[in-house]
């Protein structure tokens, strides 16, 4: 697709020099003072620590009435809940802890079914993800773990949550945010030439590159979000991606703790990384700022910015359609196409 009018080109946005500028110099403005989430309900996945926890905290600061912490470990989720309840600035919003395991399709479906039973759902932020130091596979699906969690299970959840997000309040549609990454723009994505595409992620890599695979998993999400936004009107659910930037104080790279690569990465993070509170603010902007103009777009530092350059290349249309068809076929048990059609009927 042709890029909308941005303040920066996709290629410049993806450059390392611009990344350093964003990390060390750029500022994220505060959320507008008139934003009030009183009466609203939000889900934040991966919210027991790091960016997810800080995002949840900031939503409560904005007056959110009900927060659902979606976590793999209920014990850690309950500890996060207690931390938020003890925060005097977080108000008196209700906080629930729900189990969600993105390595299991059954868990995703059960979570989505539970969400559909809510009286209302205004915001869903899909923040949970992982960064794998070693290549491993999910036995039940055969897919490499990073692609399974960051892409397949995440887009299954985002699509299943659309029905719950379909607003009962005509003044503002529900908002669905997929947390993305700068690394999507840096991915070589050699798998784009394969047909089918997804099946390549069931094969062992010739040489494991954890940043490349993480970036590819986030790029796949950008392709899917772009296709999904074409099929779901912004007036029904507004869908966007958020880039929190490279932050310290997160558990994303915990899989590499104790390794030389992990030590180097954590040291680098302390030099150029942003505090999690700043990264979370970008996510919150994607959830509460903007209007329908953010639909199908990518928000960073309180602005709408370009996604990975490939998203705007001529070949993106064919790649996006191929990936969409393969993804819906892989997730056919969930009847996602029918769910999408029901939203607009």
From Swiss-Prot:
Keyword vocabulary terms for this entry? NADP, Oxidoreductase
Key word Glycoprotein present? no
Give the pathway annotation. Secondary metabolite biosynthesis
Q: What top-level branch of life does the organism fall under? A: Eukaryota
UniProt-listed InterPro entries: NAD(P)-bd_dom_sf, SDR_fam
Segment forming the signal sequence: none
Q: Active-site residues? A: 180, 214, 218
Family label:
Belongs to the short-chain dehydrogenases/reductases (SDR) family.
Q: What is this protein called?
A: Short chain dehydrogenase virG
């Amino acid at each position: 697709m042709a890029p909308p009018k941005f303040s920066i080109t996709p290629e410049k946005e993806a450059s390392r020099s611009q990344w350093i500028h964003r990390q060390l110099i750029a500022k994220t403005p505060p959320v507008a003072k008139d934003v009030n989430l009183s009466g609203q309900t939000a889900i934040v996945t991966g919210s027991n620590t790091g960016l997810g926890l800080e995002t949840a905290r900031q939503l409560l600061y904005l007056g959110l009435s009900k927060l659902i912490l979606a976590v793999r470990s209920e014990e850690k989720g309950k500890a996060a809940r207690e931390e938020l309840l003890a925060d005097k600035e977080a108000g008196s919003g209700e906080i629930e802890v729900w189990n969600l395991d993105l390595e299991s399709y059954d868990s995703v479906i059960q979570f989505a079914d539970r969400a559909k039973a809510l009286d209302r759902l205004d915001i869903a932020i899909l923040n949970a993800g992982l960064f794998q130091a070693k290549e491993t596979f999910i036995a039940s699906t055969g897919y490499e773990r990073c692609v399974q969690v960051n892409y397949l299970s995440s887009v299954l959840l985002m699509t299943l949550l659309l029905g719950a997000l379909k607003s009962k309040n005509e003044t503002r549609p529900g908002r669905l945010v997929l947390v993305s990454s700068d690394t999507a723009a840096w991915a070589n994505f050699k798998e784009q030439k394969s047909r089918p595409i997804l099946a390549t992620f069931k094969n062992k890599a010739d040489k494991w590159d954890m940043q490349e695979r993480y970036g590819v998993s986030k790029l796949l999400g950008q392709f899917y979000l772009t296709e999904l936004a074409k099929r779901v009107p912004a007036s029904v659910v507004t869908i966007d991606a958020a880039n929190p930037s490279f932050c310290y104080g997160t558990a994303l790279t915990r899989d590499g703790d104790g390794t030389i690569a992990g030590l180097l990465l954590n040291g680098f993070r302390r030099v150029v990384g942003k505090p999690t509170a700043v990264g979370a603010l970008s996510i919150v902007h994607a959830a509460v700022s903007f209007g329908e103009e953010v639909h199908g777009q990518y928000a960073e530092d309180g602005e709408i910015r370009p996604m990975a350059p490939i998203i705007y290349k001529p070949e993106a249309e064919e790649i996006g359609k191929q990936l969409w068809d393969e993804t819906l076929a892989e997730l056919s048990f969930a009847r996602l196409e029918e769910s999408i059609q029901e939203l607009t009927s």
